[in-house]
Each structure stands twice: as structure tokens, then as C-alpha cells.
């Protein structure tokens, strides 16, 4: 029969192994440039042959200093992730420029795979995130040029330009090569196929006609 100390050691090893498997692995080589054409399906991308790698795999002429035209909610997101720079594969980071029209917003959304840190380059932004159930606490702040704010991974967050006359610009860094995004309104009212209006009417405590009207709108994909 195993001794108590042996059982404790086995339990500790099992816990350590479980924690190791539950987090993203660190790179095991200098780089693993994504091979976009590989038939191998892995969590991320297979590595391109290092002998075929060149500097362009780590470069993108993105012109992130150039203003972008905003959409009907008054924002435009220019994302640079592993799909634009294959060299980001396994490195756990991406970047985005967000342009905001006067009174424009980046609507409430989440990044299921990344924490975000946002820096205001120009203008003013009202930003915030909401904690999970049951408290649903709002943490919000008005940011000015040079200010920085963090949005924890997976939590609903937003940015809004309160200035009716001046645009705003921000840069966001995200802790994933592919952070993903779920824009709340798009997901709930613009899903394909649509969620039953009976389900949504009860969830939001409104008439079915209100839900039908919302689902009939054009839910533009503006996310990163």
C-alpha cells in the first residue's frame, strides 16, 4: 500500500501536469512561422520549414499610422494577427489600430482568447468592461491621449468617443496570435441561422416584434 507521502507526491504531480496542459505552450524553438498551406490541423498552425523563412514572414506594410474610414457605428478596426504576419504563430501577441468617428464606438464585445491593453493616441475615449455573473459590475474610465486601460480576457468591453466634433485613435495589443472577437449585438441578433425570437423575447423581456425588428437589421462585422 502506498504511503501517505507517496500519495501526496502523486497528487502534486497530477496537479502540476493538469496546470501545464491547461495553459498555452511556450515556443520550443526561436520561431514557428505559420505554414498556411499545410494540411496538418493543429491548435494554431504547423511550422514552416525554417530554411524557407525570410524577413517578410515577420513584416506587414500595414500603415497603422494612416486614418481609416469608419463604419455605421463609427469605428474601424485594423487588426494585425497571425493571418497577416505568419511569424506571430506561437508568439501569443497581436495588435490593432482602432479609428473612432465623432460619437463613434467599438460596440460591446469580448475576446475569448486574449487580454487587451489599449492606448489612446488621439482624442478622448470612454471605455469600460463588465464582470461576470452574478455581479455584472461595470468598470469604466474616460481616457485621454496617452492613457492606457486593460480589458481582462473574455469580459465584455467597449470604447466610445464622446466628442461630437473630433475623431479618436487607439492602439490595442492583445495576448494572443488570434484573439477572436464576439460582438454581442451581432452574435445575439445577427446569428445565422437566427436564434428563436421566442427565446430572445423572453430573455430580454420584450415583445417578439421588437426582436424581429432587431434581427432584420444589418449587423456589420466590425471586430478584432
Curated annotation (Swiss-Prot):
Record's function text: Plays a role in broad-spectrum disease resistance. Probably has no oxalate oxidase activity even if the active site is conserved.
Q: Read off the Pfam families from this record.
A: Cupin_1
Query: Glycosylation positions?
Result: 76, 135
Against InterPro entries, the record matches this protein to: Cupin_1 (IPR006045), Germin (IPR001929), Germin_Mn-BS (IPR019780), RmlC-like_jellyroll (IPR014710), RmlC_Cupin_sf (IPR011051)
Q: What protein name applies here?
A: Germin-like protein 8-5
Q: What is its main location?
A: secreted
Compartments, record wording: Secreted, Extracellular space, Apoplast
- Native species of this protein? Oryza sativa subsp. japonica (Rice)
Q: Where is the Cupin type-1 domain?
A: 62-212
How does this polypeptide assemble, per the annotation?
Answer: Oligomer (believed to be a pentamer but probably hexamer).
Binding locations of Mn(2+): 109, 111, 116, 157
Which GO molecular-function terms appear in the entry? manganese ion binding
Instruction: Give all cystine bridges in this chain.
Output: 32-47
Amino acid at each position: 500500500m502506498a504511503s501517505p507521502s507517496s500519495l501526496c507526491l502523486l497528487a502534486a504531480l497530477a496537479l502540476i501536469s493538469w496546470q501545464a496542459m491547461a495553459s498555452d505552450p511556450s515556443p520550443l524553438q526561436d520561431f514557428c512561422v505559420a505554414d498556411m498551406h499545410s494540411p496538418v490541423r493543429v491548435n494554431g498552425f504547423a511550422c514552416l520549414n525554417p530554411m524557407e523563412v525570410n524577413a517578410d514572414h515577420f513584416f506587414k506594410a500595414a500603415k497603422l499610422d494612416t486614418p481609416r474610414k469608419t463604419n455605421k457605428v463609427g469605428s474601424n478596426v485594423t487588426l494585425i494577427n497571425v493571418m497577416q504576419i505568419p511569424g506571430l504563430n506561437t508568439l501569443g501577441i497581436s495588435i490593432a489600430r482602432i479609428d473612432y468617428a465623432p460619437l463613434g464606438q467599438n460596440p460591446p464585445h469580448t475576446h475569448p482568447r486574449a487580454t487587451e491593453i489599449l492606448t489612446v493616441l488621439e482624442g478622448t475615449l470612454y471605455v469600460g468592461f463588465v464582470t461576470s455573473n452574478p455581479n455584472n459590475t461595470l468598470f469604466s474610465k474616460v481616457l485621454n491621449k496617452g492613457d492606457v486601460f486593460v480589458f481582462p480576457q473574455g469580459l465584455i468591453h467597449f470604447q466610445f468617443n464622446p466628442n461630437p466634433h473630433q475623431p479618436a485613435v487607439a492602439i490595442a495589443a492583445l495576448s494572443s496570435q488570434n484573439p477572436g472577437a464576439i460582438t454581442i449585438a451581432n452574435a445575439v441578433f445577427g446569428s445565422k441561422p437566427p436564434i428563436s425570437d421566442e427565446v430572445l423575447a423572453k430573455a430580454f423581456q420584450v415583445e417578439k416584434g421588437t426582436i424581429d425588428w432587431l434581427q432584420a437589421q444589418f449587423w456589420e462585422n466590425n471586430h478584432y
